[in-house]
Amino acid sequence: MARFPLFADKKQAARHLLKRLLLALFSGNGDLHLENLSLTGEHAAYGFSPVYDPTPMRAYSIHNMLAPMSFGGYGDLDENGNPVHLRLALERFTASLGLRITTLDRLLQELRPVVESLPDRINDLSRLPAEHKDRLIRVVTMTLDAAQQG
């Protein structure tokens, strides 16, 4: 059986994975599980699957978690017994993908206008109750701030 490379440009695939994680975190989709990170394709045309359920689950208190899977030690304790915060976890995850921290910073800058527009877009959702809108807006704002704190 022939072997096909999954991605011709592994750095680009790693960057895409990091970007997908950031978008899930910033949109309040605390449900970024492996189904939403699966690979699809056949022959030599493999790639990431679409996001199957982009619902911002963190709008609902019962589902308000940052991510279902740990990354970069987020929430764990460091060598001094302090919790690993989001920015450090993102830096660690970025490094584990073989990317530079400057790539993370560039992605944060690229996504910032999209994320900053989310509160207005959330407020425009006619079927989402005000309580859930408020929670989701807080999540979006706090997550962006935490990701940028160095």
Task: Walk through the language-model features, giving the residues of each.
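Anionic ligand-binding catalytic core segments
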Residues: 1-34, 38-150
